[in-house]
Amino acid sequence: LLQAVCDEDFLALASGLREIMQLPDPKARIDALMMGYARFALHHPNHYRLMFMTPRAPCNQDITQIQQGNTEQDAYVQLKTVVQNAFDAGLFKPELDDFELIAQTLWAGIHGVCSLEIALGHEPWINWKNLETRIEHMQSAILQGVLRNPDAH
C-alpha cells in the first residue's frame, strides 16, 4: 500500500516536471527543474515528507507502477537527463567530470531548503528569511559552484 501511495506521488512529481524537459536552453532547464522540484515539495509538504523525509523500505521493483529510466515517469532520470545534456554541452567546470554527482548535488541543495521549510518553517527560534529568496539563493550558490560560466545565460 505504501508503495502505491509513493508511486502516485512520484508520478505526480515527474508529470509536473515533464514540460521542463522541452525547454531548449540547458541552463534554463536546470533552473526550471530545480524550481519545479521546490514548488512540488512546498505545495505538497505531506506527500514530500513521505517521499523524501521518512525512512522506508527501498522501492520494490516488482510492484512499482513507475518504469525506472522512463523520463515520462521517473523524476530522478529527468534530473539526470537535464544535467547530462548540460554536461554534454560543456556547461560545467572541467574538473567536474561526473554528471550524476552533479545531479545529486543540485538535488541535495534544493532538498535541504525544502525539507528545512517543511520541518522547521514555523519554528520561532529561527528568524527565517523569505522562502523564495532562500530557494533562489541556494540555487544560485550551487550553480555558481558548478557552472563554467554561471552568468553566461
Go through the PLM ranges and name each one.
Residues A12-L23, G109-L116:
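Solvent-exposed, amphipathic alpha-helical segments
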Residues R18-H47, K93, F99-L106:
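Hydrophobic alpha-helical connector segments
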Residues L1-R18, D31, M35, Y76:
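An amphipathic alpha-helix adjacent to DNA-recognition modules
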Residues L2-Q3, D7, K27, Q68-Y76, ...:
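Amphipathic, non-membrane alpha-helical segments in soluble helical-bundle scaffolds
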Residues I63-Q65, D88-M138, N149-H153:
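Hydrophobic/aromatic-rich alpha-helical bundle segments in the mid-to-C-terminal region
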Residues D31, M35, Y76, K80-Q84, ...:
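An amphipathic alpha-helix signature
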Residues R39, H43-T81, N85, L91-F92, ...:
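Short secondary-structure transition hinges
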